[in-house]
Amino acid sequence: MGITSLDKRHTARMETILKYKNENLDEVYQSLQNEFYNDSILLNHRTYIEENNLGYGEKPFHVIWREIINSQPKKFKFLEIGVYKGQVLSLVKLLSDLKNKECEFYGVTPLSNVGDKYSKKYDSVDYALTIESLFKKFNLEFDLNTNIINGSSVEEDVKNKIKQLGIFDVVYIDGCHDYDCVVSDILLIKEITKNGSYIIMDDASCYKPINRIGAHLGHSDVCDAIKDYIENDNCFEEVICVGHNRVFRKIK
């Protein structure tokens, strides 16, 4: 599917968001945060996540996910690298169901509290049960053996399993934040995406002109990997930056 075909699926709201990329990033963030509070679906999901310590991120990210899902066809494929406790994976499924879209979704994650140099260790919980419980809370279909690949995305056997799933329309990268790991993930997505696919990078805005007080801009390893392997690659264009999330689209 080419870029022209994908653009025809954009809602008017998505077109407006696309125009944000050249505007003040702090204003973009605030505008989307205001919009978040006017969407009860997003508000309910994010509130549950925050109250139960089920994820990181920020409120405006939910709005971007809504618009990305709105832009997808009736059937599409989604991959998340670094699921943690299931916030984004469940949100994508929730929004897909609300739009009567058939989303074939997968998450790659070690199902443990293993960290990286930025996060030495995460909570000591049963990650499989935590993710299953989150999906159950929102009445979302989920099968651990089908929807989760247990392991690290840098492991060769895990990479092979991902490649066997085919081509993805949307990929979210929030796995290991170490430079070599991020590079490995970026090289992988170049193989498993197509023209028009969205790639969302977390912790990615270290070098962006964001002046919001208290803003978390990301991690230097992630940002350096993006600079070296996405920004310097004419296969991608940046769609929008919201806080420490950056959205790219594959164009060739």
Describe the residue ranges of each PLM region.
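Rossmann-like AdoMet
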Residues: 1-56
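S-adenosylmethionine/decaboxylated-SAM
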Residues: 32-252
